[in-house]
Amino acid sequence: IVAGWSAYPRQLDFVRFREIADKVGAYLFVDMAHFAGLVATGLHPSPVPHAHVVTSTTHKTLAGPRGGIILSNDAEIAKKLNSAVFPGQQGGPLEHVIAGKAVAFKIAASAEFKERQQRTLAGSRILAQRLTQADVAAKGISVLTGGTDVHLVLVDLRHSELDGQQAEDLLAKVEITVNRNSVPFDPRPPMTTSGLRIGTPALATRGFSEEAFAEVAEIIAQTLIAGAEGNTGVLPELKARILELAAAHPLYPNLKKIGE
């Protein structure tokens, strides 16, 4: 039994998954790549005590270098995993990536990292709340499941004049990067879609406060409303507001320019 997700805005019940697996004599495999940072800080239930095998990336919400980890509490399974990975699947070690993972794991144990994850959750909830308000709903735009418990929001465009591709392109024009995403019972083709997936970890990493997240949420809402109305004349002003936010939250605030 496989549990995990890449576009689901709620928590999973790993206890129940394990009960079902035990009942039918199955192994439980959980991929927590998307929400590992939340698990590390206690803001999301951990699958590790319940699953036979857990996998994760070391980037995404863990915010480390690109890579992966495989975990198991079962010694026999762990031995088989080790034998399967090396030498069959893995070659020479990349020491710089290993060092990057070590730094990421140390940071993940810090109070600063937990505060960042808390802002990540706060930001996604602020976004979900804004996108469920009446002016947005009037354009046929809603939020899947009505909210979020995690670091992302899945916008439902099935009843909107906008499709996922159009909405993605509109937001790109105001310098907001999101991705179109299929939603349950999606009537549109998979390369068009009727949804948007919007995540908040990158903004939290850049130091966005709840007030800044509220401004981003407002700009996203106004962009989607304008697109649904065919009123693209407001996009330059919305873009300017985003650029102002980005300038106030630089990627590397402590990085000095060469020559300084």
Curated annotation (Swiss-Prot):
The keyword Amino-acid biosynthesis applies. The record marks 59 as: Plays an important role in substrate specificity. GO terms for molecular function: glycine hydroxymethyltransferase activity; pyridoxal phosphate binding. GO terms for cellular component: cytosol. It is found in: Cytoplasm. GO terms for biological process: glycine biosynthetic process from serine; tetrahydrofolate interconversion. Its cofactor is pyridoxal 5'-phosphate. It catalyses: (6R)-5,10-methylene-5,6,7,8-tetrahydrofolate + glycine + H2O = (6S)-5,6,7,8-tetrahydrofolate + L-serine. The modification N6-(pyridoxal phosphate)lysine is found at residue 60. InterPro entries: PyrdxlP-dep_Trfase, PyrdxlP-dep_Trfase_major, PyrdxlP-dep_Trfase_small, Ser_HO-MeTrfase-like, Ser_HO-MeTrfase_PLP_BS, SHMT-like_dom. Its EC number is 2.1.2.1. Keywords: Amino-acid biosynthesis, Cytoplasm, One-carbon metabolism, Pyridoxal phosphate, Transferase. Pathway: One-carbon metabolism; tetrahydrofolate interconversion; Amino-acid biosynthesis; glycine biosynthesis; glycine from L-serine: step 1/1. Catalyzes the reversible interconversion of serine and glycine with tetrahydrofolate (THF) serving as the one-carbon carrier. This reaction serves as the major source of one-carbon groups required for the biosynthesis of purines, thymidylate, methionine, and other important biomolecules. Also exhibits THF-independent aldolase activity toward beta-hydroxyamino acids, producing glycine and aldehydes, via a retro-aldol mechanism. Belongs to the SHMT family. PANTHER family: SERINE HYDROXYMETHYLTRANSFERASE, SERINE HYDROXYMETHYLTRANSFERASE 1. Homodimer. This is Serine hydroxymethyltransferase.
